């Protein structure tokens, strides 16, 4: 059986990808160099371990989390790794160019790699809404546009609102979710009759998705604390994230059983809701003064995630035609907004406790940053969706959505692989 992947794309994609990689190599040759400062060995090892945690989360966690479609698990894992590798390279260059004026040599440090990895992770989150409906060439365009849009957002927030690295990246959950949902909304929506089977989850891919959720669950404190400079803030961020995640697990399993008429547990609900606490405390994890607050936030986040996973597909998939919206929307966008609201409330309380009279100004700044992030996400997502609809990319036909056979060579073709 011959591949249904358009022949023109199969022929030009390797050449285009290698040409893009060669261009990146030249940019690294002319515009980058390693940090020559002497850093103590203990600090170097600790910094590398945080970067390693982020890479595990991105490559294994987010890669396997999106592999729950029965006939699209290979592409989900491999395409995520491809996007991560490309996104990190482009993010390092872009962050270096945007952070200095006039432009000069980009200094590569372990911290800049951490920052680039988190920027690339936003693409992997967004791609969860479109994987199975686009080819690799379209994903390359999506990586370049989204990393550029997120870098621009960070630069604008940093210059206008004068925030540090952690604060100007705290919106990346919301940004990634709404960017991905906007791109998915622009793509061809209906699945033809007879192809709905490709959109179904199976037991083995669901176990793979749960494995990805476990990787994310174990290493999520590293994401929430990766860009914090103060040791006290890093400690608070890690502790509060662990407490919130622990409560999310209990809430996910209990809530999943409660949501089923026969009190059975749904793997789909569980592998999304166990991560709810980590997303919800991501923005404010360093400000939470007591573990019980993080635990309450994890409980509320778990319930919202279960409710979103149960209710949103019924109304949103039919109205918007966006597949996989349950995980994307109930985890990252809804809980990202919950985290933003929590941050504003804690900021107000912190300002009152310290006797600062600038409460209204601080709230206005926070709302302005969030609004700017959503506007840029929707605008750049719409632009990306329109670009991906161009015929030059030879997008997969809707009859071949969520089908690994379009992209991969199999040693044998068997029904239900």
UniProtKB/Swiss-Prot annotation:
Consequence recorded when altering residue 41 to R: Found in antigen C(W)/Rh8
Query: Does the record carry Transmembrane helix as a key word?
Result: yes
Where do the TM regions start and end? 12-32, 44-64, 77-97, 125-145, 172-192, 203-223, 238-258, 265-285, 287-307, 331-351, 358-378
Q: What's the protein's topology in the membrane?
A: Multi-pass membrane protein
Name the Pfam families for this protein.
Answer: Ammonium_transp
Q: Cite a single GO MF annotation.
A: ammonium channel activity
Keyword annotations of the record: Blood group antigen, Membrane, Transmembrane, Transmembrane helix
Effect upon mutating residue 226 to P: Found in antigen E/Rh3
Q: Which GO terms describe its cellular component?
A: ankyrin-1 complex; plasma membrane
The record's subunit annotation is: Heterotrimer; a RHCE monomer interacts with a RHAG homodimer. Component of the ankyrin-1 complex in the erythrocyte, composed of ANK1, RHCE, RHAG, SLC4A1, EPB42, GYPA, GYPB and AQP1. Interacts (via the N- and C-terminal) with ANK1 (via ANk 1-5 repeats); mediates the primary membrane attachment site for ANK1.
Q: What is this protein called?
A: Blood group Rh(CE) polypeptide
The scientific name of the source species is Homo sapiens
Q: Which gene encodes it?
A: RHCE
């Amino acid at each position: 059986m011959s591949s249904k992947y358009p022949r023109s794309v199969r022929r030009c994609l390797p050449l285009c990808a290698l040409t893009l990689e060669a261009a990146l190599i030249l940019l690294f040759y002319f515009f980058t160099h390693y940090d020559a400062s002497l850093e103590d060995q203990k600090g170097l090892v600790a910094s590398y371990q945080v970067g390693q945690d982020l890479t595990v989360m991105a490559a294994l966690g987010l890669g396997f989390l999106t592999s729950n479609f029965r006939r699209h698990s290979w592409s989900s894992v491999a395409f995520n790794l491809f996007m991560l590798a490309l996104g990190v390279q482009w993010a390092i260059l872009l962050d270096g160019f945007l952070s200095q004026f006039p432009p000069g040599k980009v200094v590569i440090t372990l911290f800049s790699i951490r920052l680039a990895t988190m920027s690339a992770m936003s693409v992997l989150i967004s791609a969860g809404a479109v994987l199975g409906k686009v080819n690799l060439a379209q994903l390359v365009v999506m990586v370049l546009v989204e990393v550029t849009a997120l870098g621009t957002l960070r630069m604008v927030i940093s210059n206008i609102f004068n925030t540090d690295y952690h604060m100007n990246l705290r919106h990346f959950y919301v940004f990634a979710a709404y960017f991905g949902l906007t791109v998915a909304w622009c793509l061809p929506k209906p699945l033809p009759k007879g192809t709905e089977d490709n959109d179904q989850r199976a037991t083995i891919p669901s176990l793979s998705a749960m494995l990805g959720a476990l990787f994310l669950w174990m290493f999520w404190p590293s994401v929430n604390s990766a860009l914090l400079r103060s040791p006290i803030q890093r400690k608070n961020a890690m502790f509060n994230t662990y407490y919130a995640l622990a409560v999310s697990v209990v809430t996910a399993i209990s809530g999943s059983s409660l949501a089923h008429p026969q009190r059975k547990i749904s793997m789909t609900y569980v592998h999304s809701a166990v991560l709810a606490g980590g997303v919800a405390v991501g923005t404010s994890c360093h400000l939470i003064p007591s573990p019980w607050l993080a635990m309450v936030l994890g409980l509320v986040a778990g319930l919202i995630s279960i409710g979103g996973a149960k209710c949103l597909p019924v109304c949103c998939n039919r109205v918007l035609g966006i597949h996989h919206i349950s995980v994307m929307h109930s985890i990252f966008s809804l809980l990202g907004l919950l985290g933003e609201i929590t941050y504003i409330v804690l900021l107000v309380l912190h300002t009152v406790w310290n006797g600062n009279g600038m409460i209204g100004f601080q709230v206005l700044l926070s709302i302005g940053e969030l609004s700017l992030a959503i506007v840029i996400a929707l605008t750049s997502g719409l632009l990306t969706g329109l670009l991906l609809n161009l015929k030059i990319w030879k997008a997969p036909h809707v009859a071949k959505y969520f089908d690994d056979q379009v992209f991969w060579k199999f040693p044998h073709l068997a029904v239900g692989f």
